[in-house]
Curated annotation (Swiss-Prot):
GO molecular function: RNA binding
Lineage, opening ranks: Eukaryota, Metazoa, Chordata, Craniata, Vertebrata
Name of this chain's protein: Ataxin-2
Family matches, as InterPro entries: ATXN2-like, LSM_dom_sf, LsmAD_domain, PAM2_motif, Sm, SM_dom_ATX
Keyword Ubl conjugation applies: yes
SUPFAM superfamilies named in the record: Sm-like ribonucleoproteins (SSF50182)
Biased composition (Gly residues): 205-214
GO biological process, one term: neuron projection morphogenesis
Amino acid sequence: MRSSTAAVQRPAAGDPEPRRPAGWAARRSLPRTARRGGRGGAVAYPSAGPPPRGPGAPPRGPRSPPCASDCFGSNGHGASRPGSRRLLGVCGPPRPFVVVLLALAPAATPARACPPGVRASPPRSGVSSSARPAPGCPRPACEPVYGPLTMSLKPQPQPPAPATGRKPGGGLLSSPGAAPASAAVTSASVVPAPAAPVASSSAAAGGGRPGLGRGRNSSKGLPQPTISFDGIYANVRMVHILTSVVGSKCEVQVKNGGIYEGVFKTYSPKCDLVLDAAHEKSTESSSGPKREEIMESVLFKCSDFVVVQFKDTDSSYARRDAFTDSALSAKVNGEHKEKDLEPWDAGELTASEELELENDVSNGWDPNDMFRYNEENYGVVSTYDSSLSSYTVPLERDNSEEFLKREARANQLAEEIESSAQYKARVALENDDRSEEEKYTAVQRNCSDREGHGPNTRDNKYIPPGQRNREVLSWGSGRQSSPRMGQPGPGSMPSRAASHTSDFNPNAGSDQRVVNGGVPWPSPCPSHSSRPPSRYQSGPNSLPPRAATHTRPPSRPPSRPSRPPSHPSAHGSPAPVSTMPKRMSSEGPPRMSPKAQRHPRNHRVSAGRGSMSSGLEFVSHNPPSEAAAPPVARTSPAGGTWSSVVSGVPRLSPKTHRPRSPRQSSIGNSPSGPVLASPQAGIIPAEAVSMPVPAASPTPASPASNRALTPSIEAKDSRLQDQRQNSPAGSKENVKASETSPSFSKADNKGMSPVVSEHRKQIDDLKKFKNDFRLQPSSTSESMDQLLSKNREGEKSRDLIKDKTEASAKDSFIDSSSSSSNCTSGSSKTNSPSISPSMLSNAEHKRGPEVTSQGVQTSSPACKQEKDDREEKKDTTEQVRKSTLNPNAKEFNPRSFSQPKPSTTPTSPRPQAQPSPSMVGHQQPAPVYTQPVCFAPNMMYPVPVSPGVQPLYPIPMTPMPVNQAKTYRAGKVPNMPQQRQDQHHQSTMMHPASAAGPPIVATPPAYSTQYVAYSPQQFPNQPLVQHVPHYQSQHPHVYSPVIQGNARMMAPPAHAQPGLVSSSAAQFGAHEQTHAMYACPKLPYNKETSPSFYFAISTGSLAQQYAHPNAALHPHTPHPQPSATPTGQQQSQHGGSHPAPSPVQHHQHQAAQALHLASPQQQSAIYHAGLAPTPPSMTPASNTQSPQSSFPAAQQTVFTIHPSHVQPAYTTPPHMAHVPQAHVQSGMVPSHPTAHAPMMLMTTQPPGPKAALAQSALQPIPVSTTAHFPYMTHPSVQAHHQQQL
C-alpha cells in the first residue's frame, strides 16, 4: 500500500526546508491542485502525485504500512482529485466502520515505512513506554487500510527534527504544539529518502495543518487566514468525520487490549475522546452490560487508546438522500412506516354493554380485581372503602323533623342554585349541542325561524341585508305585512307596501317601519310571528311569515300601532288605490291616491288593531274591526278592507289609506285634507272622515267580510281618491292630507299597543282559519262568508252595503275569493257595467266613506275611471260593500293613476300595477301573511264579493307583483317616492308606496287610469316596481304568478297595494295583488273566473286583490284588464309564461295554485291564473300571450299590473307556490321575467290620458273603458321588465 508513499514522495524534490516560512509562502503560490493536495513543499507535486482513485485503487510502488493520511485520502472520494486523498477519502463511499488505529512509536524514531505488505498492528498496552510518544506529539504517518472504513495509525519512524525540517503536521493525533522535530504525519511531511514514505496523516489529509494558521482551504479553497485551530481541530476532514459520528456507538480499544463501548460524545484538539454510558465489553458474555458496569462518561486520553471504531455509520449520508426534514428525521429516529392496521374483532361484545365508556368507570380494570391482584402477587392489602368514608360524611336518612328540615333546606338551596341565571348559563354552555357556526354565525339557518315558508327555496339561504327587503316582499310580504299590520292594517297591499318598505328597512324592524310610516314599528308587530320585525323585513324572515300568514296579522297589528304613521303612508297609498272607488281613483290624482292610501294605512294602523285583529281571524277581525270600526273600518274599507280581512290590520291599513285618500282626494277634493288628517290623526279622525268609511268598517270587522267589503270600500275610496286626484284641488288636498297623515299615522301607531294584542289574537284566529280553510275550501268560503257577514254587520252599522256584501260573499264564496279579487278589480273597474255595478257600487259606497277616512285611496291612478266608477258605485254602494272582501275591487282607476304618473319615474313597470286601485292590494299586503284570515295559504279563500264584483279576474292581480319586486325594496322608501309623489306619504312607509306609486301612474298614463287602484298598491309596493325587476329576475316566471297572486293576496296590506313587489312578500304579494286587482267585475268570465279565481282569491287572488290595489282599480273597469294584460296582467296571468294567452296562463296558474295549495299566496296566484284565463273578456284580448289579452272585459283586472313586476316580486321565491305556479303556467316561465313587463304594458285603446305609459314603458289602459286594450306586445314586456329593474 504505497499509494500514500508515492504521494508523500512527490514533494521529495522539495527540501524539508521549503516547509519553513519561506516554503509556506512558496506553497501558497503553488497551483491550486498542488495546494489542494495538502502536501507541503515548494515544488509542485510530481506527475505521480495524484493518488490512486477509488477506495481499492492499488497503491503505486511497494506497499507500505497503512497510514491515516492514505486512509482518508486514497480511500476517499477525494482521492480522485490530486492532493485530496486524505480527508476526501472519508467522504468517499460508505464504510461499515471507521477505525482509528493509533500506533504509538517513540518520538525520536526516524521516519521509516513499514515493511511492504506488512500491516502494522497497533501495539498493545505492553509496548514499552519508551516507545510511546508523548501525548499530543506528531505521530508517524500510516498508509491507508483498504476495505472497510477504518482508520489506523501505525507507528512510523519520525525523522529527526532537523532532518524533517517541516512544520509539525496536523496529523490525526498530532497537535500544533508538537515539536517540529517530530515528523508529523502531516500531509506536508516529506521524507528525505524516497524509500522512507511519509504518509500524510488523516489530519493532514484534512488539509488543516497546524502551521496553516489561516486554516486550510481543504477542497473548498476558501482561505480563512484569521482563523486557526489547534491540534486535530485544524484538520477539517478529520473534524468533519468525528463530528458526524457524534452520538454513534463507538468502541475504543485501549493499549492494554481492553475494549470499551459507549456513545461517542466529543473529542478534544488533542484527540481525547469522551464516551457516554461507557462500559467494558467482554467477549465472553453476549448479554448486555450490567447497570453497575456502565459509567456515565469516560474520557480516553489520546495516549491511552489505540483504535477507535464507529459501527453502523454512514459517511455518505450527506450525499445520498435529499436533505428534507422527513428524510433526516427518518434517519435519526428510524423508519416511520405506516403501521399495518388490523381489524378489531369485538367477538361476543355488544356495543351497548362492555364497550360503553360512559358506563365503565373502572378505567378498564375493576378496582376489586386490582386489589386482588396486588394482594396475591405483592401481598399488599388495600384499605380502599367504596363509601369514601375518609372523605365524606355519610347521610343517615331518618324521618326526624330536623333531618327533614335540613333536607328541605338543602333542596331549596339546590333549586335556588339551579334556577340562578348563572347556573343556567353555565349549564347551557355545557349542554349546548350547537356547533360553533350555529352559535356565532350571522346566518340563521333554522327553518322554523321562517315561520312556515317551508316551500320557499330561500329557507336556508343567506340573504344580504341589501336584498332582504325584496325577498321579504317576495316571500315575506305577508309576514312583513303582519309585522306592519298596524300600518298596513287596511289592506294587505298597503300592509305589504309598508311591509316591503319596512322590509326594505327590514334590517331594523323599527327602522323600517319608521321609514315606511315615519314612526318606528313597535316590536310587537313581529311578535305575532316568531321572528322580530327586522327578521320579517329580512328576506328569509319575510318568507316564513308568508307561510305563517295567519300568525303574521297579529304581528302586523302590533307593528301597525308602532308604525301606523309610516305604514299608513306606505300602506295607505296602496290600500286607497284599491279601496278608493273608481270614481275616486279617476277623480283624484292617481299619485295622490297612492299617498292617500298610505295615509289610510296610517289610519289603518290606528284602527287597524281592530282590523288586524279581525283580519287575523274573521270573527276576531270583525269584533276588533267593529270596535275600531268607526275609526278602523272607515279607513279599513278605504284602503285596508282586504288587508283587514286578510290580516285583520288591513282595516287600520285602510284607515291609513283613507287618510291618504283624503289627502289625495278625501271623499272629495275638498275633504281630502280633512279626511287624510282624520285617518292619520288616528281613529277619531278616521271616524270623522269615516262616515263613509264605516261602510268599509264591516270589511275590517271580519276578514272575509273585510275582503268582500274592503274591495267595495276600497272601490269607494278609490273613487273618492280618484275624484280627489282627478281634481287638482283634490290632488293637492290629498297630498296635504297624505303629508299630514304620517303624523296622524304615527299617533295611531302609538295608540296601537292594544292592537298588538288584538293582532296576535287575530293571528291565532287567522292561523286556525288558515288551517281550516286549507282543509275545507268550501267551509273556508263559508267561514269567509261568515267573516264577511261579520264585517258586513260591522259595516251595517255604518251602511247597508255590508249586508249586500255579506250576501254577495255568501252567494259565491269561490266568487268571494274570486270576488275579492274581482271586488278589487270590480271596484276598480266600476266602469265594467256587468261586474262593477254592484261590486263597484258597494266598493264605491264603502269607499266613499273610506275615501273620506282614507282620503287617499291608491286608486288615484285610475282617478277618472274611478270617478265614473265612483258614481256607479254610489248607485251600487250596497253591492260594493257586500264585496267588501274585494277592497282591491275598488275601481281600477288607472286613469287616476295617470295623474300620479309623474312619480312613475322610479319604475316603469309600476304603472301596470298602478291602474289597479292598489286599495285592495293595500289591504291585501298585510293579509298576505295574515292570509289565513282571508284564505288558508293553500286553501282558496272565497271572497264574498258582490256578484258584480265576483268577476274579478285573478290575472289582473298577477301584474301587481311586478311592482312588488320593486316594492320589496320598500325599505328603500326613498326609491318608492321616485315612483310616485303620493308615495311621499307623510310616513316613511309612504316611500315604498311612493316609489311604487308614481311609476305606476307615470309609466302607464292609460294604465294610470287603469292602474289607479294599483297605484295605491304601488305606494306600499312601490318597491314592487323597483323590486319587480329584481324579483322578476330572481323568479320571474316561476314565482311571479304564484307569488304575486298569493303573496299579494296574503300580504295585501303589507305591500300588495302600493307595490306588490315592494312588499316583503313581493313575489307573492305582487302576483296576488295583481290577481286581486285583476279580479275584474267582468261577468263573462265571472263564473269561470270565479271558481278559478276563487282559488286565486282564496289563496292568491284575495291576497292579490289586497296586494294589488290595482286589482281594485281594474275591477273598476272591465277593459282595464286588457290594460293590465298589456303589462301587468299578462305577467300576472303568465304565472310562468306571460306570452301564453291569459286563459292558458290562468290555467297554468290554476295548476300552479293547485301545486301551491300549501302556499296560500302562491296558490292564489295560480288560482288567479286559472281564473283569469277563463274570462272571455280576457280571451278576446289581441295578445294571447298576455293573460290580460285573455280577459278583455276583465282587462281592468289586468290593470297593467306589470306581470313582470309581479313576477319579479314573486321572483323571489318567498313561497313554494311560486315555482309550481310558474311551472303550471307554462314553460314560459323563463320568458316571463324578461318579457313580462313589456307584455304587461298594454296600450289603452279607450283611455288616452293613461297613454303616458312612458314611465312604465307600458301602454296605459283606461281602467274605466271596457274596450280591450291592445297589448304593447311582448317587446313591451321587456320594457316593462326594465321598468321593474
